[in-house]
């Protein structure tokens, strides 16, 4: 499919109108939100998938992604994997840290695919 107007830049998630006869995009509806990395638009939720260990949770990457999501009013779901590789105490300390520092601003789902926990 081609874009009729060179000034239109279509990205994943865009709602478009197109001419079926000419097989071209004729317009792009106003985006409700969009992210630069990855380039997406009209996002209802964003799921962030991080492991708690191996590799360890990268708080800097997480904060950058969270800030981008909040700037665009996109609700966040955080999935924490590999919880079977840490003790219950370590997991609880980590979850308490997230909840206290981020004031319960997103949903957290701890999972373990190895032990079939949270799936």
Q: Where do the language-model regions lie?
A:
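Context-gated lysine
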Residues: 2-7, 23, 30-32, 64, ...
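N-terminal accessory targeting/assembly segments
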Residues: 1-59
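Conserved beta-strand/loop subsegment of P-loop NTPase cores
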Residues: 43-50, 70-83, 102-112
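Noncatalytic linker/hinge segments flanking ATPase motor cores
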Residues: 22-24, 69, 87-92
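Histidine-anchored nucleotide/phosphate-binding helix
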Residues: 60-73
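Residues at alpha-helix caps and immediate loop-helix transition turns in enzyme cores, especially N-
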Residues: 58-61, 90-91
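Canonical P-loop GTPase G-domain recognition
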Residues: 84-119
């Amino acid at each position: 499919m081609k874009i009729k107007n060179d000034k239109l830049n279509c990205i994943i998630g865009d709602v478009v109108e197109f001419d079926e006869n000419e097989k071209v995009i004729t317009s792009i509806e106003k985006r409700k939100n969009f992210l630069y990395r990855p380039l997406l638009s009209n996002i209802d939720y964003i799921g962030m998938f991080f492991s708690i260990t191996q590799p360890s949770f990268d708080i800097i990457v997480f904060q950058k992604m969270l800030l981008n999501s909040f700037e665009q009013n996109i609700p966040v779901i955080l999935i924490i994997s590999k919880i079977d590789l840490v003790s219950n105490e370590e997991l609880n300390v980590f979850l308490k840290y997230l909840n206290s520092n981020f004031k319960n601003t997103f949903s957290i789902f701890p999972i373990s695919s190895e032990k079939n926990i949270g799936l």
